[in-house]
Amino acid sequence: MMVSFRNFQRIHLVGIGGIGMSGIAEVLLNLGYQISGSDLKLSPTTERLTALGARVYEGHAAANVTGSKAIVVSSAVDAANPEVQEARRLLIPVIPRGELLAELMRLKYGIAVAGAHGKTTTTSIVASVLAAAHLDPTFVIGGRVNQAGTTARLGKGEFFIVEADESDRTFLLLAPVVAVVTTIDREHLDQYSSLEDIQDCFIQFVNSVPFYGAAILCLDEPNVQGIIPEVKRPIITYGVSNQADLVISGAKLEGFGSEFRLTYKGEDLGLFHLPHPPGIHNVRNAAAAAAVALYLNVPAELIREGLAKFAGVGRRFDVKGVVNGVTVVDDYGHHPVEIQATLEAARTCKFNRLLVLFQPHRYTRTQHLWDDFSRSFNLADVLVLTDIYPASESPIAGVTSEALAGAIREAGHKNVFYFRSMQESIEHLLQEARPGDAILTIGAGNVSRASNELMLLLGTERPTHHAH
């Protein structure tokens, strides 16, 4: 461990309850650091950190930073935050989350998974496979890994797996040995000027690996294939294309999982089973993880075991349960491509109908991808929209869920509804649902609360419910 890092024994995290921050806090606590943090509201996540030895303050106040050697902030924290201002006054270093993640990664061999879609699931599968291979990896992931029950873990092995977030360009601070790119898409257009700008960033990210490292790239994605000529490092491609180094074939999508064959550089590795989550996009995510493991010389048998043990990630096609014949699924999808992939995956699960409650996330994203959103819900038999989750943004004139519902209707959807309140949305879905249907709550805001409520209410008798 570097002496200089050890001098910074007390570290304070502003927004410690956030999904990316809590994972870093957990690793630091397990490394023996004194950790404090603050968040607007306490939550099960902050309670977990308190139990691990963190001191967590509710609300932000200047006094919270006293005695800290460094302050870590997520991209959601602005310069006007009283804790940031106090740290500046006291000349305490204020560092972005991505920078601290990069420092932690230097301590081991880094494996960084980037991409517009699929990175949380892929990172989690990599962790599952390396754990099955007895490599005891450390990981920091932007979602709860179901079999580990946590977003982060400090392992004794030499590999550090992180989800690399391109949303604010901080993934360029990372220095991984293996860089994975699952997808590149028009996303985070408040930070990037164009798709080419995003691709340039991914090229920089991939070329940051050392000469003995590897870039693992999805050949099925045109926007990823587009960066290959600019990559100056060893490349392993994966996909259903026979031009890939790791070829997926014979994929069968059944229930909540899949079965498929993998062939690596001409060698048949046999059949693999991924029990969760469903969809061809998750077969690709599993192949990305297999490519990482193959590069690290993990035997195919252990890769097979790691995939077979994978229990999914929180809020990624998260099956909450079945009540009175109705299946409730919660999903984090907030980009049109993700929503379409989730609905296509749900179609393979053989439900009678798909009833969708969608909460758009951010006014800017809704505005930038308006036309795409209006065409993303064709596979939803019934679509209910509730108000946009602002995520600290100010409203934009004309950008409302009500107007989006109108645009979806104009694009040809015959069964789309808008309700201002989450409660009315839930009521409508309860009246609509019949045995054999699935209700999907989709969005990156607080829509998963609705999935919990639906689970409760589906189990209670209501006079408004359809007679079966």
Task: Enumerate the predicted regions with their spans.
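N-terminal leader/targeting and accessory segments in enzymes
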Residues: 1-100, 222, 244, 249-250, ...
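Phosphate-binding loop of NTP-binding sites
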Residues: 4, 27-30, 50, 64, ...
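Active-site beta-alpha connecting loops in nucleotide-dependent enzymes
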Residues: 7-19, 24, 34-40, 313, ...
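Adenine nucleotide phosphate-binding catalytic loops in nucleotide-utilizing enzymes
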Residues: 9, 14, 49, 186, ...
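Short acidic low-complexity segments
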Residues: 55-67, 150, 421-424, 429
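Short acidic/histidine-rich motifs immediately flanking catalytic phosphotransfer sites
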Residues: 65-70, 158, 434-437
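Glycine-centered, small-residue-biased loops immediately flanking beta-strands
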Residues: 213, 381, 437
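Short, flexible loop segments at boundaries between secondary-structure elements
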Residues: 385, 459-468
